[in-house]
A protein has these predicted regions:
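Second-shell loop/turn segments in exported
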Residues: 1-5, 86, 130-135
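Acidic catalytic loop of the alpha/beta-hydrolase fold
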Residues: 61, 85-92
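C-terminal catalytic histidine-bearing segment of alpha/beta-hydrolase fold enzymes
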Residues: 109-154
Length: 154
């Protein structure tokens, strides 16, 4: 369970370990089901991270732990939401992504980017070799994230 206390304790330990190794701002980046974890961490481990990046977010309101169903108003760090316009995963429909931004009422900076690059998707639409994983444009997506983290703006 990605919003359980046990999972959050694990995330706390990872954050503490990274901070011990490097004196730099630490961001959490979650992809797909990892967005559930990253969102829960931003809500419950406040002060432990500089910001959050959510890619290919679980947005389906059918899932109790979906990103838009969590207490997004409790997040008080910058948030980037990156999603592929052609993501066909049933839990990650692009049309539901704006619900995340609407919920981030107290994030000082929040940005939604709908991405359209890439090529040659194959296999399961919810896996990394499809639009869900920014297939054919992974480097471009990572560069976009890294550049935004360096200079987060709305």
């Amino acid at each position: 369970d990605r919003i359980s206390d046990t999972h959050l304790i694990d995330l706390h330990k990872v954050l503490a370990f990274v901070k011990q190794k490097a004196d730099v701002p630490v961001w959490i980046v979650g992809t797909s089901r990892g967005t559930v974890s990253a969102t829960a961490a931003a809500i419950k481990l406040q002060g432990e991270m500089a910001g959050v990046v959510l890619t290919s977010s679980v947005v389906s309101f059918k899932k109790p732990e979906a990103v838009p169903r969590q207490d997004l108003a409790a997040i008080k760090v910058p948030v980037l939401v990156l999603h592929h316009t052609k993501d066909a995963c049933h839990l990650c429909q692009p049309s539901e992504v704006p619900a995340i931004l609407r919920g981030l009422k107290n994030a000082p900076i929040k940005k939604e980017i709908m991405f359209s690059g890439g090529a040659n998707p194959s296999g399961n639409v919810c896996n990394g070799q499809h639009w869900h994983g920014f297939i054919g444009a992974e480097r471009e997506a990572v560069d976009l994230i890294a550049n935004w983290i360096k200079n987060p703006v709305n």
